[in-house]
Amino acid sequence: MTVRLTSLVKRHLGVDPEITGVTADSRKVKPGFLFAALPGSTVDGAAFAAKAVEAGAAAVIADLDLNLSVPTVVCRDPRRGYALAAANFWGRQPQTCVAVTGTNGKTSVANFCRQMFAGAGHASASMGTLGVTVSRPGEADLQVTPPGLTTPDAGDVAELLMHISRLGVTHFAMEASSHGIDQRRLDGVRLSAAGFLNLSQDHLDYHLTMDAYMKAKLRLFEQLMPRGATAVLNADNEAFPFFAAASVVSGQRVMSVGETGQALKLMERTLLPDGQRLKIRADGRMWDVRLPLAGAFQASNALVAAGLCRAAGLSFEDTFAGLERLNGAPGRLQRVGAGPRGGEAYVDYAHTPDGLETVLSALRPHVRGRLIVVFGAGGDRDKGKRPLMGEAAARLADVAIVTDDNPRSEVPAAIRADVLAGARGAKEIGDRREAIRAAAAMLEDGDILVVAGKGHEQGQIVAGVTHPFDDVEETAKALELVHG
C-alpha cells in the first residue's frame, strides 16, 4: 500500500515521494515511511529524525525544518499533522464514530454503545482501556487488541479503524481521555457525536490545574467535532454549562441528558434487587426502562450511552431495549461472589476521589450491615488526590483498608501515609493480597466489600516491574479461603 505524500499532508511540496507507512516511533520506520518527529515532555522526536532517515524514511513531519536529505513537512502542530496524515494514509473508518470523555465512566459508556449498536443489528466496535472489541450480530465478540492505553497513538488509532472497517464494522465508540485529546490522538477520527460524563480531580500530574484538565476535554467539542454533529452532555454535572457553551459556539446540536436534562430526562429511579428501573421522558412520552446495573452513576452512564446511540441513528425503541440488555464492563462494579457467612464482594476500577465516592454511594443502599472498602493510590501520579480518596473512603465506608496500588517508583509506605492523612480511622495493610484477604474474612450477612482501584487490570507495578495481580482473581481466592 502506497500513498503520495501530498495526498497525506494536503499541501503542495517540491517533491512528492510515495509513502508506505506512517509512524512516530523511529524504531518502527521502514523504507518509504513518513516519520513524525513529535515534541515530548522528556524526549523530542526531532532527535531521532536522522536515525529515521537512515532507516529509510521518505519524509518527516516536524515543527521546524530539520535540514534532512528528505522532505520535511513543517507543521505548527506536528501532533495534529501526524494524526491527519495517518488517517489519510489508512483511509477507511466505520461510517458512524462516536467518542465519550469524562473523569469516570468512559469505559462503561463505550462498551454500552457497542452492545447497543450490536443489539440493533449493526456490526460494532469499542476502543479504550479494555482494548478493541468487535461485536457482530450472531457471532461471539472478537477481542482485536488487549487492554492497554485508554486512547492509543494516533497512527495506531487510524490503522485500527481501517482494520475493523475491513471486518465489517459500521458503528464505533471510543473513549476520549484528556491525555489522548491533548496529544491529538483523536484528531484523525471522523466523529458524528461525542459525549461528556463528568469532571472531577484526576491527572493533575499531567495537566497541573483543573482548568487545564477541563480545557483538554473541551477541545473534543471545540475542535474535533464538525459543525452539525451532536454533543451528548450530562446536564447533572457542574461542568455542564461549560461544555454546552463550547458545543453551541462550535455549531453542534446539544442533547442534554439526566435529571436536569431535556432530551433524555430521568424522571424517576427505583432500586431493584438486580438493578434499577428508570422512568425517562423523551420524544414527548415516558419510557419505562429496566436497567440491569446498580448505582446512580450507571444510570448516568446509561443515559449518555443512550444519547450517543440516538445521535448515531438508533430508534428510541432500539435504544431503550438495548439498555435493558446491557452487561457491565469488566472490573466496573463487578460482582465476584459471597462469603460463607453472607455478604457480597465486588471489584471496581474507581481510582479517583469522585470515582470512589460514586461507587461507595451506589452500594450503600444495598448494605444491611457494613460497607467495607480496600483501596490505594497510584505512585508517580496526582498526589493531591490521595488524601481526598482517603477522606471519601473514611466518610462513606464503615471499614476502610488502605493498601498499595501500583506504587511504581515511589516508596509504598509514603503513598499510604498520604492517603491515611485524609482517612481517619482507616486500617493500613500494605500488601494488597493480604488486605483483600483480611477484608474478605470480615464479611458477614448484609455486608458488602468493594476492592477498588484496579478493576480489569492484571498487574501491580512496583519499582518498574509489573507483577501479575488480578483483583477479581485475588478476591475470589480470598473468599475461597474464608469458605475453607
List the predicted regions and their residue ranges:
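Glycine/aspartate-rich loop-and-adjacent alpha/beta segment that forms the canonical ThDP
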Residues: 448-481
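Glycine/threonine-rich flexible loop motifs
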Residues: 46-47, 183-184, 205-212, 382-385, ...
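Receiver (REC) domain switch/active-site residues of two-component response regulators
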Residues: 58, 192, 398
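Phosphate-binding loop of NTP-binding sites
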Residues: 82-235, 241-252, 366-367, 483
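Short glycine-rich anion-binding loops that position phosphate/pyrophosphate groups of nucleotides
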Residues: 40-41, 178-179, 201-202, 237-238, ...
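N-terminal leader/targeting and accessory segments in enzymes
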Residues: 1-88, 230, 265-272, 286-288, ...
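Acidic, Mg2+-coordinating active-site environments of NTP-dependent enzymes
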Residues: 5, 62-69, 167, 173, ...
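Active-site beta-alpha connecting loops in nucleotide-dependent enzymes
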Residues: 38-43, 329-331, 354-424, 432, ...
